[in-house]
A protein has these predicted regions:
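N-terminal alpha-helical targeting/anchoring segments
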Residues: 27-77
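Dual-mode signal for accessory low-complexity, basic/Gly-rich regions
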Residues: 11, 247-433
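Internal metal/ion-chelating core segments
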Residues: 152-252
Length: 433
């Protein structure tokens, strides 16, 4: 890698080489049976150069790096203007990204998938269970002509489980899973979640249209948090799509809410030591006690806004040029109580575990509308059964300003987000008929 950078410096003012190697063993089950084992390994190389003030870029696979320089130089004459200095040497955070528990052989992965599928299949003879169990190891390297040289290895264990059951006109679909850099009890938690939702979901209960207290599970919060993340994205701010462009330092939400992007959590799914541009990973307060504190920025959007990069210049799996993106998202709500008490405080309400179609709206309006894919009616603190053919409508900006009623002390990971169960008041539910 150093040799290529040295050669690039002979014909370009700046150069950067990014390399990621991924080894993965995914085991897949479908319809209660082993579907396949697809072990794979790949290496992606990406060279960025700045030549005569223009950006050149090229990617390749495998170990042969030499053609990259010619390809990048050829694209530079058509590239965008570039006047940003690449990052120099920097102190990197201390983050644990590998753990022996995630080094798993194929037989162990198969056994875990088999255990999940067999347990779900016991619920009902017609239930179709699926599972994806994977162990992935990555090594990321980045070196540039300004003196930055960084490398880290990372391991991720993932388990995703699903179940489908059709009884007459009633269709029940469930899913749950975890991504983590440390294997603990994720298999057991996935099974427990799916079995519990199956047991509660077998009974359909009627619900009328109206305003309800709603508890969003950590998994169900993804669509609710998304407008906040989209508004904080540096590209949306730069282009003027985000309503937060001129709102830094303003209190837009209740004091109880804080929202962070944190790439420095050991063993978390989206942690790293540096981003795809060589900026050290950090914890960024997007919202702190209701105040808009920062945006999610890579180098380009940071310069456009007159701010500093937050270390969120992430690349796609093909190594393409970075764009602003989130690492680990952490939602914090003041005034928590045990989940059992939070649920017990609901006289009549709904638990929402997943939505369908909520992504289709305009995130910058804060409005989220979607079908309740999996939700349950709660009366006097007890789950009565599954609600069907219902839609939820919530303006996230208003909800986080005036409608927070509480949150669970327990937090759970849902993909790359760590969040509590969140209780909101006066949420609109529309029921069919």
């Amino acid at each position: 890698m150093q040799d290529l950078i040295a050669k690039a410096k002979q014909q370009a003012q700046q150069a950067e080489l990014y390399q990621i190697t991924v080894t993965e063993t995914p085991v897949r089950y479908e319809n209660n049976k082993l579907k396949g084992i697809d072990a794979s390994s790949r290496q992606i190389n990406a060279l960025r150069i700045v030549k005569d003030g223009k950006l050149g870029f090229a990617t390749s696979t495998g170990d042969n790096l030499q053609p990259l320089l010619d390809m990048a130089a050829a694209t530079a004459q058509f590239g965008r203007d570039w006047d940003l200095p690449l990052p120099g040497p920097a102190a990197l955070p201390q983050v644990q990204l590998t753990h022996p528990s995630t080094v798993l052989d194929t037989d162990t992965l198969v056994e875990m998938g088999e255990k999940l599928v067999r347990r779900l299949a016991k619920c009902h003879p017609d239930l179709l269970a699926s599972a994806d169990v994977s162990a992935r190891q990555t090594t990321t390297k980045l070196i540039n002509s300004q003196g930055f040289a960084g490398e880290y290895s990372k391991s991720i264990f993932s388990i995703l489980g699903g179940a489908e059951l059709t009884e007459g006109k009633n269709f029940l679909s469930l899913y749950a899973g975890y991504f983590s850099g440390k294997r603990e009890d994720q298999l057991e938690k996935t099974i427990e979640s799916l079995v519990s939702n199956y047991e509660h979901g077998r009974t359909n209960v009627p619900v009328k249209s109206g305003k309800y207290t709603v508890i969003f599970t950590p998994q169900g919060l993804g669509d609710i948090i998304n407008p906040l993340l989209e508004c904080a994205n540096g590209l949306a701010v730069e282009k003027g799509f985000s309503p937060w462009k001129d709102k830094l330092g303003e209190k837009l939400f209740a004091e109880e809410i804080s929202l962070f992007d944190d790439a420095t959590i050991s063993f978390a799914p989206a942690s790293c030591l540096f981003d795809g541009e060589g900026i050290p990973a950090q914890r960024t307060a997007i919202i702190e006690k209701g105040v808009i504190n920062n945006f999610i920025l890579n180098m380009v959007t940071a310069k456009a806004l007159g701010l500093k990069s937050t270390g969120n210049g992430f690349r796609s799996k093909n190594g393409e040029l970075s764009s602003p993106g989130n690492s680990n998202v952490v939602l914090e709500i003041n005034g928590t109580q045990p989940l059992e008490q939070l649920l017990g405080s609901v006289k009549q309400g709904i638990i929402i575990d997943s939505l369908m179609g909520a992504w289709a709206g305009n995130p910058y309006s804060g409005q989220v509308n979607g079908n309740i894919a999996l939700g349950f009616l709660v009366e006097d603190g007890r789950i009565k059964g599954r609600v069907k053919d219902c839609m939820v409508s919530v303006n996230v900006f208003e909800a986080f300003r005036h409608q927070i009623e509480g949150a669970s002390a327990e937090k759970e990971w849902a993909w790359n987000m760590l969040a509590p169960h969140l209780k909101l008041s006066d949420i609109s539910i529309s029921a069919k008929g």
